């Protein structure tokens, strides 16, 4: 019911000589893509950003109750997670390292423009709906795979999704 560590130096004991570099918080590449389309009086824009090839240490998953039903027990010794233990030493291992790659729909806007007479104060009125942080495509188990340069995710609140309805006059 405990984690197993590899004796890398084959000395017969697990000690500081068995440590090695696990993962890399630096992405192999980052990308973004913006698309703007207009058709008649409709306009649509969408902006994607993504990060690929980085690793994230998910510290929020150390002893989480949401997976306690998948923990090792005497009755079921083949479960995915080790037994619950409040006194476990949390030596880092690849157990907590996850792929931090993601693609996010950062912003999306849909608008409609109503042309007005040129004699009026305004030439046209545009109504729009905008959403920030619409969706994130990722295999990461935490709320948000976009972490700082340390590559450590400690939990916290997820990014907010913000809806805006407006008019340009």
Placement of each model-derived feature along the sequence:
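Long hydrophobic segments that form regular secondary structure
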Residues: 24, 28, 33-42
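Repeated loop/turn-to-beta-strand initiation elements of outer-membrane beta-barrel proteins
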Residues: 41-44, 117-118
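Outer-membrane beta-barrel pore domains and translocons
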Residues: 38, 49-51, 130-134
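Membrane-interface anchoring segments and C-terminal beta-barrel signals
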Residues: 34, 69-169
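Surface-exposed, extracytoplasmic segments of Gram-negative outer-membrane nutrient-acquisition systems
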Residues: 1-26, 43-101
């Amino acid at each position: 019911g405990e984690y197993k560590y590899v004796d890398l130096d084959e000395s017969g004991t697990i000690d500081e000589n068995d440590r090695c570099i696990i993962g890399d918080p630096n992405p192999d590449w980052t990308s973004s893509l913006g698309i703007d389309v207009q058709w008649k009086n409709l306009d649509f824009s969408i902006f994607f950003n993504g990060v690929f090839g980085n690793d994230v240490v998910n510290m929020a998953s150390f002893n989480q109750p949401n997976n306690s039903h998948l923990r090792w027990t005497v009755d079921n010794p083949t479960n995915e997670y080790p037994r619950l233990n409040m006194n476990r030493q949390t030596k880092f291992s690849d157990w907590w390292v996850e792929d931090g790659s993601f693609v996010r729909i950062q912003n999306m806007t849909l608008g409609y423009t109503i042309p007005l007479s040129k004699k009026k104060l305004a030439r046209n009125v545009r109504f729009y709906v905008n959403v920030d942080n619409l969706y994130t495509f990722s295999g990461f188990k935490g709320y948000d795979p976009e972490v700082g340069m340390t590559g450590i995710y400690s939990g916290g609140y997820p990014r907010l999704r913000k809806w805006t309805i407006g008019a340009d006059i």
